[in-house]
């Protein structure tokens, strides 16, 4: 059988919520604002498909460099390259440093 090559392929465990975390996110997470230069973690929320970056960026840490509508532009290192991803605040967590 031919292997699927969709956007979410190979994410059976990566995009799975724990049983106690199932359901929709808190509304405050969607209204969260970040400052330019702030460090954030990219943690994908599988219950929100809009504004979700590619699953290979799940768990990466980056810097906010701008805003585009209700989404944020995050600069993330991918190997030796620096990439800009666009993500909604539901998929971003503030870094505690």
From Swiss-Prot:
CC per GO annotation: ribonucleoprotein complex; ribosome
Transmembrane feature ranges: none
GO biological process: translation
Swiss-Prot/TrEMBL keywords: Ribonucleoprotein, Ribosomal protein
GO MF entry, a single one: structural constituent of ribosome
Family assignment from sequence similarity: Belongs to the eukaryotic ribosomal protein eL21 family.
Annotated protein name in UniProt: Large ribosomal subunit protein eL21
Organism per entry: Methanococcus aeolicus (strain ATCC BAA-1280 / DSM 17508 / OCM 812 / Nankai-3)
